[in-house]
Amino acid sequence: MSTQMRKIIHIDMDCFYAAVEMRDNPNFRSRPLAVGGHEKQRGVISTCNYEARKFGVRSAMPTAQALKLCPSLLVVPGRMQVYKEVSTHIRSIFSRYTHLIEPLSLDEAYLDVTDSTQCHGSATLIAEAIRRDIWNELQLTASAGVAPIKFLAKVASDMNKPNGQFVIPPEQVQSVIDTLPLQKIPGVGKVSLEKLNQAGLYVCQDVKNSDYRQLLKQFGRLGASLWQRSHGIDEREVIVERERKSVGVERTFTQNIVTYEQCWQVIEEKLFPELAIRLEKANPEKAIIKQGIKMKFADFQLTTIEHVHHELELAYFRELLQDILQRQKGREIRLLGLSVMLKPEEQARQLSLL
């Protein structure tokens, strides 16, 4: 386990967009609600309240599918400018307690309060104070996780949702990690989890007891990362004012695909909606300069293609898909990904002065 013990808080707003809508319109509070696009325009759900989640509605789900699961679902369009203003207010609350703030999206952030003198230096009390300030000033709830390392703080913030917090003190880190299901580790998706389970790995203790070289051989970079996490090692620092250069999503298939039609179905129904939501949460106003597609074949050869394009446009991914499939040469496809490259802030400022 890492000997450097810090005080890390992960704050995650509860169903943020939907919560803002319910706050501003009391009639929405007692019914299933989602923020998203219209079903006739092949829209997707950005987020939904907990009432809607009882019916199986989830973010990145096509609106048409969500309405089948929950016919009484009210779907309202997003108000990104409002959400951004609320997010700015939330970050101003964070800054009262520490200057070490790493925003992950409009509704989520890491805070390092190791050297903070607020609340007698107690990370637990600071998390409580932040959540109280958010409620008193914005009438919104937040959940928090407190731990000595980043990944565990993020895991902890999900343990007492909504409107709660969970604290993992240093002396309990390893005991909590040992029983932690691998699907709770950030970065472990459905396909990775299936492969881990096939290897007899279900909780972190299984990984901790495994041979490092064998993990590296079987699972590559993921195996190395899981070995570290399972031993309580996460030396990543809270990065202040991190500028995001790109946003991407990808899907590894349990069964390889081959045809253009299969690829396009994945892009249209899964990847593009997920990318749109991720981009929206990361920074809805930041300019796009490129769109790209990544493809990995059954022989593990990876290829990417990207072209200059200044809008997030589904039709343009169709052109990129046609281009990248020229490199397929009959091979099956095991991974497909979409990405957008964002304009650097400095470049954007320079252009605005011209």
Curated annotation (Swiss-Prot):
The lineage of its organism: Bacteria, Pseudomonadati, Pseudomonadota, Gammaproteobacteria, Vibrionales. Its EC number is 2.7.7.7. Keywords: Cytoplasm, DNA damage, DNA repair, DNA replication, DNA-binding, DNA-directed DNA polymerase, Magnesium, Metal-binding, Mutator protein, Nucleotidyltransferase, Transferase. The record marks 17 as: Substrate discrimination. Its main location: cytoplasm. It comes from Vibrio vulnificus (strain YJ016). One of its GO terms (cellular component) is cytosol. InterPro entries: DNA/RNA_pol_sf, DNA_pol_Y-fam_lit_finger_sf, DNA_pol_Y-fam_little_finger, DNA_polymerase-Y, DNApol_IV, IMS_HHH_1, Rev_trsase/Diguanyl_cyclase, UmuC. Belongs to the DNA polymerase type-Y family. Poorly processive, error-prone DNA polymerase involved in untargeted mutagenesis. Copies undamaged DNA at stalled replication forks, which arise in vivo from mismatched or misaligned primer ends. These misaligned primers can be extended by PolIV. Exhibits no 3'-5' exonuclease (proofreading) activity. May be involved in translesional synthesis, in conjunction with the beta clamp from PolIII. Residues 8-189 form the UmuC domain. CDD domains: PolY_Pol_IV_kappa. Its cofactor is Mg(2+). It catalyses: DNA(n) + a 2'-deoxyribonucleoside 5'-triphosphate = DNA(n+1) + diphosphate. This is DNA polymerase IV. Mg(2+) binds at residues 12, 107. Binds 2 magnesium ions per subunit. GO terms for biological process: DNA-templated DNA replication; error-prone translesion synthesis; SOS response. The active site is at residue 108. GO terms for molecular function: damaged DNA binding; DNA-directed DNA polymerase activity; magnesium ion binding. The gene is dinB. Monomer.
